[in-house]
Amino acid sequence: MPFIENEGVKIYWDEVGDGPAILLIMGLAYPSQMWHRTRPVLAERYRTIAFDNRGSGRSDVPPGPYSIEAMASDAAAVLDAADVRNAHVYGVSMGGMIAQEFALQYPDRVRSLILGSTTAGVPKSVRASPEETLRLLEREQSTPNEAAEAAIPFIYDPGTSRERIDEDLAVRKDWLPRSDAYINQLMGVFAWDSHGRLEQITALTLVLHGANDHLVPPSNAEFIAARIPNAKLVMIPKASHIYSTDQPEAAHGALLEFLDSFK
């Protein structure tokens, strides 16, 4: 299993497929295995490079907090290890924040930018309802399995089958985060902000969002797409925060249409 070390932290990464490179950046407390629906689709025509953020999966759990800037540096180190100068960069949720920071810090390394289910930063973002925010904060009072179960109503669309949700839970079960790692990532999320910098992103950008996202309301995506100069917004009907599970065909169709336009 390949590891790289960045700032004294060991980061797990791997690659699947051939073709133009695409860097995949996962969200809060999720391992890179959660690309299990999207990665096989992309790997048919792209070189997919994925990694576990610090504190997640097989990567180290150093003392925190983990800043979004540090995790963007980890992403750059992964591309260095893969000997990739520039790549399509796709981040979801917290990974979308990391992808924004990556595009701001390393603009010449971004062939295109895909931002999924994300925000320009918590301090000024449109928040979830108070009930959903409380449920997220109460996660730390639960076991990891209880927390994963409690999250279902506000990260999946009500129309998504329980069978499909259970497939996601099965992927995650061996890589549930330590509570300190979750808190360390969450502190980085709450501290980060790109609202005043979005206009500086020069990459052609696709903003993907579930139309029924209860965790990160869709108005966050509208804000991002309106301020990045070369951005296109796609709202996915009947989808919530994890749109690749709610509506995989629609999500992957929009993603491939965008990526294939660069060939």
Where on the chain are the PLM-derived regions?
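Conserved HGGG/HGGXW glycine-rich cap/lid loop of the alpha/beta-hydrolase fold
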Residues: 7-61
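Active-site loop/oxyanion-hole signature of alpha/beta-hydrolase fold enzymes
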Residues: 50-90, 253
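Gly/Ala-rich beta-loop-alpha elbow adjacent to hydrolase catalytic centers
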Residues: 91, 95, 99
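Flexible "cap/lid" loop of the alpha/beta hydrolase fold
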Residues: 100, 104-105, 111-140
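Conserved alpha/beta-hydrolase catalytic His-Asp/Glu region
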Residues: 125, 145-197
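Short beta-strand/loop motif that positions the catalytic acidic residue
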Residues: 201, 207-209
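Acidic catalytic loop of the alpha/beta-hydrolase fold
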Residues: 212-216
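Catalytic active-site module of serine/aspartate enzymes centered on a nucleophile-bearing elbow/loop
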Residues: 231-263
